């Protein structure tokens, strides 16, 4: 019979499989980023690390020489951070530079302040920003950070999510990890509804426009829940909500990520590595 400890280890292993650790504070250095990357790349490796663009070249060209295991994790460059007030041109250039340096994915913050001030104008700015950045990102993954904790009300969160989807977002991310409020169940609920309704509209558009060529379908879109430095139990609650809201088929890396801080990553690792069953080794397969 499974014990409480086994359930905890199973939960930690599951969360590690979808985890992205953030190293985005103003005080980050090559040394601090290296420490985060090395723990991120331990077996079983997490999805990746989110960093400012200035650190992408260091990770991809220098750190991998002394820690080759780091080559196995994704590097996501966070652009338009931390204020979210850049123009589409400047943010696109920032993304281009990060991609040239070796970034695998881009994480783009919206102008949440403008969204609060004038919703209609904020929506237009989100669509334009996301569409322009997506042009340079191309087939690589573009996550759009909605800063749900900063947006003033459920309607604004929903409209920001829809605008990001219409601009071409590959992932909707609840928050940046830098604000006072990270993911909430309410924000995840609203984003899930926005995504489901968008997928229905897009499928109907494809049907009505007669786009019936083989393989025609709405692009794959995911949700990233940024939890900050909460504990494993709270993070597991978001995993269960994701399954409840979007179904078990949504729990794949192309559709689901969990973002968090270094302390949460260490807690997940410590729990997983506490396995002590005699004669039994934990499964380390991806």
From Swiss-Prot:
Compartment list: Cytoplasm
Gene3D superfamilies documented for this protein: Aldolase class I
GO (cellular component) term, any one: cytoplasm
GO molecular function: enzyme activator activity; lyase activity
Gene Ontology biological process terms in this record: carbohydrate catabolic process; deoxyribonucleotide catabolic process; deoxyribose phosphate catabolic process
Main location class: cytoplasm
Sorted UniProt keywords: Cytoplasm
Disulfide feature: none
Subunit structure: Homodimer. Interacts with ADF; the interaction enhances ADF activity in disassembly of filamentous actin and inhibition of actin polymerization.
Function: Involved in regulation of actin dynamics.
Protein name: Divergent deoxyribose-phosphate aldolase-like protein
């Amino acid at each position: 019979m499974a014990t409480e400890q086994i359930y905890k280890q199973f939960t930690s292993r599951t969360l590690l499989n979808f985890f992205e650790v953030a190293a985005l504070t103003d005080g980050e250095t090559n040394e601090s980023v290296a420490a985060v990357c090395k723990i991120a790349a331990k077996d079983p490796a997490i999805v990746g690390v989110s960093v400012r663009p200035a650190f992408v070249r260091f990770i991809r060209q220098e750190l991998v020489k002394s820690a080759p295991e780091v080559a196995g994790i994704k590097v996501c460059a966070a652009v338009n951070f931390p204020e979210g007030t850049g123009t589409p041109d400047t943010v696109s250039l920032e993304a281009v530079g990060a991609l040239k340096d070796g970034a695998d994915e881009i994480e783009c913050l919206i102008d949440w302040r403008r969204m609060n001030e004038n919703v209609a104008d904020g929506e237009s700015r989100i669509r334009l920003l996301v569409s322009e950045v997506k042009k340079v990102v191309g087939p690589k993954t573009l996550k759009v950070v909605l800063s749900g904790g900063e947006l003033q009300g459920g309607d604004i969160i929903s409209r920001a999510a829809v605008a990001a989807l219409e601009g071409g977002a590959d992932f909707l991310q609840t928050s940046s990890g830098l604000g006072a409020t990270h993911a909430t169940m309410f924000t995840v609920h609203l984003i899930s509804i926005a995504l489901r309704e968008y997928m229905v509209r897009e499928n109907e558009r494809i049907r009505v426009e007669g786009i019936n060529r083989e393989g025609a379908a709405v692009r794959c879109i995911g949700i990233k829940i940024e939890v900050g430095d909460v504990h494993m139990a709270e993070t597991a609650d978001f995993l269960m909500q994701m399954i409840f809201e979007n179904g078990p088929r949504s729990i794949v890396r192309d559709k689901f990520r969990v973002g968090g801080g270094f302390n949460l990553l260490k807690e997940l690792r410590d729990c997983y590595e506490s396995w002590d069953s005699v004669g039994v080794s934990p499964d380390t397969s991806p």
